[in-house]
Amino acid sequence: MTQQTPDQYRVFGNPIEQSKSPAIHHIFADKSQQNIDYQKQLVDTKDFSNAVADFIRHGGKGANVTAPFKEQALAIADELTERATLAGAVNTLTFKNGKIFGDNTDGEGLVQDLITNKVILNESRVLLLGAGGAARGVLLPLLAQNPRSIVIANRTASKAATLCQHFSDIRLSASGYQDLEQQHFDVIINATSASLSGNLPPIPTSLLSQNVVCYDMVYGKDETPFLKWAKEHGAMKVIDGLGMLVGQAAVSFEVWRGVTPEVQPVIDKLRASLK
């Protein structure tokens, strides 16, 4: 009996060398008996749509998209999910019946990781740090978990206000970092890239207490500066973004293959490889 040719998937980005997506998807495929081949592909910043078209021509079934191409992926999609439209970005493309379908699984990945870590979002007061693409990408799935309120805080408060208007939900409000002093939150999510450069968002330590959960979308071998700071100032629980990375990949895999993969073994494996 001849081995069937595996279905082809890609992750497009620039840079792309650091991507863990191929490893994650191959573990998912292995555990769920799915015959796929998933590779990373470096794409010139001006050549994204050509790279996608070329991949489709060669029989590609789907692709993940990472920086700096998520907005371009949105532009080339023929059809979009609501979460992709509101996120203003696409990280998952499916090629079917001559059409390109765009989705965004980042927010779902975050929410699933919070739930796995037993973080209660229902009726919680959530503080979302940052008003860029990462924050925008997770708002719809966060709102679907029925929080009491979400405050979007940003260095430039007007940018946070614009994001609130974009979603027009009464549970959303905007703030500058300097205006957070007297406020209380149950969950603080860092959607800034500050941790990547070893920095902290300038937020007051008065926000932290024994009842606060702090989540950083960034992850690494060591605890991120934000989580280290949160722990030092008494946060109840700190969680990094590795589970979100695996979670958003799992949702993409499900979109493509119709199979829900187990995420915990993959998180454990990646965590061990970071050590």
Swiss-Prot record:
Annotated positions binding NADP(+): E82, G130, A131, G132, G133, A134, N154, R155, T156, A157, S158, K159, M217, G241
HAMAP family to which the protein is assigned, alphabetical: Shikimate_DH_AroE
Keyword S-adenosyl-L-methionine: no
Protein purpose: Involved in the biosynthesis of the chorismate, which leads to the biosynthesis of aromatic amino acids. Catalyzes the reversible NADPH linked reduction of 3-dehydroshikimate (DHSA) to yield shikimate (SA).
EC number: 1.1.1.25
Species this chain originates from: Colwellia psychrerythraea (strain 34H / ATCC BAA-681)
Keywords for the protein's UniProt record, in alphabetical order: Amino-acid biosynthesis, Aromatic amino acid biosynthesis, NADP, Oxidoreductase
Family: Belongs to the shikimate dehydrogenase family.
Name listed for the protein in its UniProt record: Shikimate dehydrogenase (NADP(+))
Subunit structure: Homodimer.
Organism superkingdom: Bacteria
Pfam family, one: SDH_C
Cited CDD domains: NAD_bind_Shikimate_DH
